Amino acid sequence: MNLHEYQAKDLLESYGLKVQKGIVAHNPNEAAQAFDQLGGKFAVVKAQVHAGGRGKAGGVKVVKSSQEAREVAESLIGKNLVTFQTDAEGQPVNSVGVFEDVYPVTRELYLGAVVDRSSRKVTFMASTEGGVDIEEVAHNSPEKILKVEVDPLVGLQPFQAREVAFKLGLEGKQINDFVKTMLGAYKAFIECDFALFEINPLAVRENGEIVCVDGKINLDSNALYRHPKLLALRDKSQENAKELKASEHELNYVALKGNIGCMVNGAGLAMATMDIIQLYGGKPANFLDVGGGATKERVIEAFKLILDDENVKAVLINIFGGIVRCDMIAEAIIEAVKEVNVTVPVVVRLEGNNAEKGAKILADSGLKLIPADGLADAADKVVKSLG
């Protein structure tokens, strides 16, 4: 689950980090009032959306008066912002953040952390190349990114943060401020179950003060039951409507740009299914994992979700029966096909627990379903069904 910038900054500030002061505004008048309340000569109005690249897309503007703040807010709120990280429709802008002007600054740094699956540790990354896309830095100048793996038994130690500060070229009080920032960020990461966080840029002001000018936080969705206050910050308007609907039925769904709908149980099998569709010349329209303990109702909802995509011209159902019985899947498929007006070819491959029984149920249903014997046969048939 992603947080908006203003929410991320509020959370980081509660852990002792110095952040760029700001006020969220939901309409132009509130934006004008926020400018006056901040009391500076300048302010920065930023569209609050769950996407990067806002500046290049016109979602970040420097304003010099409350009237300018009102005008910029009016041009953003209620519109969709299209960036390199969004789809063609963009993300809806329901609010803007009006932030204090912290510039000029002497340096822009980068500080971030992720859960590194390979090392199974929280790994911090820091760089002198702040204010730019960190992926670009990693590609062009990987030597400019410092990495610190944190031992989960003892946590991030002050000496590790000091070492990073030295390598970033910080001096005097800046070192202590950076250590405080990094330690506070780690504490927030662990206590709030972050999956990812970034401060880009982490600015060094002319007076030596270190300030978080931006903030990006992604929370581990599997841990949200432990954080009801953070869950309350969820902005469903920023989420893909189909993916949101899928999550309500405990389905793992990701929309893609192909025309072959996929329903599979198990993430690994789902990825293998997408790969073999691609191998046979097809294009998957989605990733959809109904889970190892899929119920009849969940399968029906998954089928509806796939067919709700107008780009889907054929469907491949690939089920390996373990905990999930293939006969139950077969009954759910029949019920879903009867309930939804299916006008596209449906290829079904069942293997494992009660597979023969499931195949017989489908064969006796009288529905125009295409049985497949094996994964390769299923991929071949679904691609050929497109004509």
UniProtKB/Swiss-Prot annotation:
Any one GO MF annotation of this record: succinate-CoA ligase (ADP-forming) activity
Superkingdom of source: Bacteria
One Pfam match: ATP-grasp_2
Residues given in the record as ATP binding sites: 46, 53-55, 100, 103, 108
Cofactor: Mg(2+)
Cofactor: how and how many bound: Binds 1 Mg(2+) ion per subunit.
Principal EC category: ligase
Annotated keywords: ATP-binding, Ligase, Magnesium, Metal-binding, Nucleotide-binding, Tricarboxylic acid cycle
Entry binding sites for substrate: 265, 322-324
Classification via PROSITE patterns: ATP_GRASP, SUCCINYL_COA_LIG_3
Catalyses which reaction(s): succinate + ATP + CoA = succinyl-CoA + ADP + phosphate; GTP + succinate + CoA = succinyl-CoA + GDP + phosphate
All copies of domain ATP-grasp, residue ranges: 9-245
Enzyme Commission number: 6.2.1.5
Function noted in UniProt: Succinyl-CoA synthetase functions in the citric acid cycle (TCA), coupling the hydrolysis of succinyl-CoA to the synthesis of either ATP or GTP and thus represents the only step of substrate-level phosphorylation in the TCA. The beta subunit provides nucleotide specificity of the enzyme and binds the substrate succinate, while the binding sites for coenzyme A and phosphate are found in the alpha subunit.
Listed PANTHER family: SUCCINATE--COA LIGASE [GDP-FORMING] SUBUNIT BETA, MITOCHONDRIAL (PTHR11815:SF10), SUCCINYL-COA SYNTHETASE BETA CHAIN (PTHR11815)
NCBIfam families in alphabetical order: PRK00696.1, sucCoAbeta
Self-association and partners: Heterotetramer of two alpha and two beta subunits.
Protein name, UniProt field: Succinate--CoA ligase [ADP-forming] subunit beta
The organism of origin for this protein: Francisella tularensis subsp. tularensis (strain WY96-3418)
Name of the coding gene: sucC
